[in-house]
Regions:
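Short, charged surface segments at domain edges that flank catalytic/cofactor-binding sites
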Residues: 14-80
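Mixed-charge, low-complexity interaction segments
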Residues: 1-30, 133-137
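Cys/His/Pro-rich metal-binding microdomains
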Residues: 49-50, 113-117
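Short flanking/linker segments adjacent to small metal-binding domains or redox-active Cys/His motifs
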Residues: 152-191
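Histidine-centered nuclease catalytic patch
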Residues: 54-112, 126, 133
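Short Fe-S-cluster ligation motifs
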Residues: 77-94, 100, 142-166
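Cys/His-rich metal-chelating microdomains
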Residues: 55, 118-122
Length: 191
């Protein structure tokens, strides 16, 4: 292609590029997930990072610890790394697209996996093959629930924490999702 361009034949360069390495635009779609959608994926995956197999912790369990111990376990509302405990990057679960949407992957549950914020940032728009990563099998939420049972039980025992809108919102979503999975609000799986 470059040889054709150097020879002044832009049309031939375009043809070669289109044939051997074409640009395929992907429609941009906005992605926003409800707390319940996130929790369904986290429970389905057993609160495991599907890229590393590492245990993840319920988002509001981490935030509750930050509310209780802000000096020792700080969390910045806008994820400022210099003002947040590193656990928020290592252990905080998020949804990632196994096949990136930017690369043509579908924004649907069959293409969603649980991962940490850290690995989500590292993966970005790359495929597992490009990174040399593999997909770990899902965990079992009856063995590890990401401290969901602890979180709901702690809020129930400390109702003043319901004043925190983030914690209250995640509490409602967690109780609902645990109901879908037939877990009591405060059942703790073995660790």
């Amino acid at each position: 292609m470059v040889a054709a361009v150097d020879a002044g034949d832009l049309e031939e360069g375009r043809l070669i590029l289109g044939r051997e390495y074409p640009f395929t635009p992907v429609a941009k779609s906005s992605r926003r997930y409800t707390d319940r959608q996130c929790l369904r994926v986290f429970y389905r995956d057993g609160f495991l990072d599907r890229y590393s197999g590492t245990k993840l912790v319920h988002p509001a369990a981490l935030r509750a610890l930050s509310v209780i111990m802000p000096g020792e376990f700080p969390a910045h509302p806008n994820w400022l790394m210099s003002q947040s405990h590193f656990a928020f990057w290592e252990l905080f679960p998020t949804i990632d697209h196994l096949v990136p949407v930017a690369r043509g992957g579908a924004d649907e549950e069959s293409n969603w996996v649980s991962t940490s914020m850290l690995r989500n940032s590292a993966k970005a728009h790359w495929t597992l093959e490009e990174l040399g990563w593999t997909l770990s099998p899902p965990g079992d939420y009856t063995q590890w629930d990401g401290l969901s049972g602890w979180f709901t039980g702690y809020l129930e025992a400390n109702p003043d924490l319901f004043a925190d809108k983030y914690l209250a919102r995640w509490y409602r979503a967690t109780v609902h999702t645990r109901g879908e999975y037939r877990l009591s609000a405060t059942t703790h799986p073995p660790n």
